[in-house]
């Protein structure tokens, strides 16, 4: 696998070299604490994701106006939006993010393989509330200084979502100053998905931070299962992006709890 993770890291390096993250605008973020939103929600807190492609599936949806998609997600009751800014393998861009940011008032996650402060500077400029760090990249020493990146992000007024896939990664992530921990049900070595990943990790490990579940969530039953396991929020991309009625799909999932 190293293979896929290495590719992701190299893609971020390539994007940095190609000046993808050189942003001339400066947009405000929502100013809303997603953690509070998740804690106070009476229904399922969804972070819905706008992504047109992925390494696992290739093309997910024809590239169209992200603002139209975002507005349907918000109307359906999404608590936050995740927008891909990584051009390689994900067909994302900071421009997509900024278009959406100008239209929505809810929290937004800059979804990318963050390896450098240049990307955090970009997150600040494009109006992100959160950016992503992947625990395994640091545990495998493919990227260094996680705490430094977290501290830098906090100084910029940003919050951090750390993604973990194994119990060890989860324990390591919980010890950091990150704001939210995401359990990725997808194994980044094999790209296989197992929702029991969230169950196994939360059965065995305490964490004082807000924990969300990510990847492979397709139905109301999935959300109810993950809720029972202890997940407080749910990051859902593909199942919504593939749906012909995005607003209704989001509404149904939000009302699953």
Q: Which positions does each model-derived feature cover?
A:
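Conserved N-terminal beta1-alpha1 strand-loop-helix module at the mouth
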Residues: 1-108, 115-118, 157-178, 189-196, ...
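Catalytic cores of alpha/beta
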Residues: 115-127, 166-177, 213, 217-236
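C-terminal helical cap(s) of enzyme catalytic domains, especially alpha/beta-barrels
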Residues: 195-204, 227, 242-257
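Generic structural signal for hydrophobic
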Residues: 72-74, 100, 123, 149, ...
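Hydrophobic, well-ordered secondary-structure scaffolds
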Residues: 100, 108-138, 147-149, 153-156, ...
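Catalytic-face loop-and-helix region of soluble metabolic enzyme cores
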Residues: 180-228, 232-236
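Glycine-enriched alpha-helix->loop->beta-strand junction motifs that scaffold or abut catalytic
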Residues: 77-78, 103-106, 125-131, 154-158, ...
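Glycine-rich phosphate-binding active-site loops on the catalytic face of alpha/beta enzymes
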Residues: 125-140, 182-191, 231-250
């Amino acid at each position: 696998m190293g293979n896929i993770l290495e590719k992701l890291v190299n893609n971020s390096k390539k994007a940095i070299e190609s000046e993808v993250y050189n942003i001339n605008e400066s947009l405000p973020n929502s100013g809303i604490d997603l953690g509070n939103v998740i804690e106070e929600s009476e229904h399922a807190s969804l972070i819905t994701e706008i992504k047109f492609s992925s390494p696992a599936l290739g093309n997910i949806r024809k590239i169209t106006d992200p603002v139209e998609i975002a507005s349907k997600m918000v109307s359906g009751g999404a608590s936050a939006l995740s927008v891909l800014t990584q051009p390689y393998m994900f067909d994302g861009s900071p421009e997509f993010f900024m278009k959406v940011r100008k239209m929505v008032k809810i929290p937004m996650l800059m979804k990318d393989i963050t390896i450098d402060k240049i990307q955090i500077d970009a997150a600040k400029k494009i109006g992100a509330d959160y950016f992503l760090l992947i625990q395994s990249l640091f545990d495998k020493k493919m990227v260094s200084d996680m705490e430094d990146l977290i501290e830098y992000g906090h100084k910029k007024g940003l919050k951090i979502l750390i993604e973990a896939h194994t119990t060890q990664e989860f324990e390591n992530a919980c010890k950091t100053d990150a704001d939210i921990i995401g359990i990725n049900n997808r194994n980044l070595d094999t790209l296989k998905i197992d929702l029991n990943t969230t169950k196994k990790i939360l059965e065995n490990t305490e964490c004082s931070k807000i924990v969300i579940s990510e990847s492979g969530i397709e139905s109301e039953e999935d959300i109810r299962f993950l809720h029972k396991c202890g997940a407080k929020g749910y990051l859902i991309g593909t199942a919504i992006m593939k749906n012909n009625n995005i607003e209704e799909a989001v509404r149904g999932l939000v009302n699953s709890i």
